[in-house]
């Protein structure tokens, strides 16, 4: 099946068009704004671009598991990594509790091999309901740093996300992302950052390109394991 854009990507692109349009409108010389005011608006679009990328990651992950649930996927149709991460996350909180209180009775009860809620992700025949919490997968890794993207996409089974994006797009997307985040961090720390509309346009073009490759890599991964209907 040919690639189709995720809902998360469509929302990102709609927001990007609005932001670039705003930056373009205030960039003209006849607009009655000072250089400082224009620069603040340009900076704001960069910060909002980063927020839009965060939102893409959140919506993409949450939509994926919503699709699994609404279409009654079996556990076997879900990639192994999110199932394993879910089990690890639940067990980790149990072990952390044991480290604090050394209550062996409680940990044996909670880790009991008959605990269906804990080990349900192991049973490939079950129908997916709420076995995996999508927020648990994405919430602590949605800030789009290269490190977070590597971890987040590994959680859904893509072990080397930048290898995939670089293969598809024939360029170094991790470097592209770092370059954008350098600008965003400079703005966040209120350091002097003079931007032009061309700077804004270039950053939006680069991040939209990155997101295109993230979306395509994810599409191929989900379709190969789960099937196109869950996209």
What role is predicted for each listed range?
Residues 41, 45, 49, 172, ...:
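Secondary-structure capping and boundary motifs in well-ordered enzyme cores
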Residues 47, 51, 205-208:
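Short, well-ordered alpha-helical segments
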Residues 1-25, 144-231:
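Polyanionic, low-complexity intrinsically disordered segments
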Residues 49, 61-165:
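Helix-loop junctions and short alpha-helical segments
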Residues 1-47, 59-66, 70-81:
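Charged alpha-helical initiation segments
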Residues 58-59, 188:
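General alpha-helical segment detector with a strong preference for membrane-spanning helices
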Residues 1-4, 27-35, 42-47, 114, ...:
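Generic, low-specificity signal for short hydrophobic/alpha-helical stretches with a mild N-terminal bias
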């Amino acid at each position: 099946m040919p690639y189709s854009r995720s809902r998360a990507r469509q929302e990102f692109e709609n927001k990007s068009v609005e932001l670039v349009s705003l930056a373009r409108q205030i960039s003209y010389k006849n607009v009655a704004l000072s250089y400082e005011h224009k620069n603040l608006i340009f900076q704001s679009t960069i910060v909002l671009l980063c927020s839009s990328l965060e939102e893409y990651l959140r919506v993409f992950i949450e939509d994926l598991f919503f699709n699994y649930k609404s279409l009654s996927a079996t556990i076997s149709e879900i990639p192994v990594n999110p199932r394993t991460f879910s089990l690890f996350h639940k067990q980790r909180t149990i072990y952390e509790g044991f480290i604090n209180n050394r209550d062996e009775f409680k940990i044996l009860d909670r880790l009991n091999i008959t605990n269906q809620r804990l080990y349900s992700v192991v049973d490939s025949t079950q129908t997916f309901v709420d076995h995996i919490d999508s927020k648990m997968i994405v919430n602590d890794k949605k800030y789009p740093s290269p490190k977070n993207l590597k971890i987040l996409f590994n959680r859904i089974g893509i072990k080397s996300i930048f290898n995939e994006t670089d293969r598809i797009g024939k360029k170094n997307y991790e470097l592209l992302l770092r370059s954008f985040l350098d600008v965003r961090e400079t703005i966040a720390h209120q350091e002097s950052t003079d931007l032009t509309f061309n700077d804004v346009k270039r950053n939006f073009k680069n991040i939209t390109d990155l997101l295109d490759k993230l979306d395509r890599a994810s599409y191929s991964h989900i379709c190969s394991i789960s099937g196109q209907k869950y996209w």
